[in-house]
Amino acid sequence: MKFSTTPTLEGQQITEYCGVVTGEAILGANIFRDFFAGIRDIVGGRSGAYEKELRKARQIAFAELEEQAEALGAQAVVGIDIDYETVGKDSSMLMVSVSGTAVKLRH
């Protein structure tokens, strides 16, 4: 499966637009508690533990996106948008969402 944030794939011809596909993952409140408890892990202004959790959430969201695209018979997803939103009571959770257009390509 190919992924692109652009509306086209260079060197590939899109033959069919299959529809919009999405994927979401939510990090619970414990990630924020763990993040602040592990503030000592911050090196150079970055938290390895927090970045690891965000990476995992992004991977889950992309896996859902890919699953939906495959179900539509697509070979690629173009125009991908990645968003991060706080949700829940007191904005205690972080949602990672990805969306794009599933497409079929000429072989």
Swiss-Prot record:
NCBIfam families recorded: PRK02877.1 (NF002776)
Segment forming the signal sequence: none
Similarity comment text for this entry: Belongs to the UPF0145 family.
PANTHER family referenced in this protein's UniProt entry, alphabetically: UPF0145 PROTEIN YBJQ
InterPro entries, alphabetized: UPF0145_dom_sf, UPF0145_YbjQ-like
Protein origin, superkingdom: Bacteria
Descriptive protein name: UPF0145 protein ETA_21660
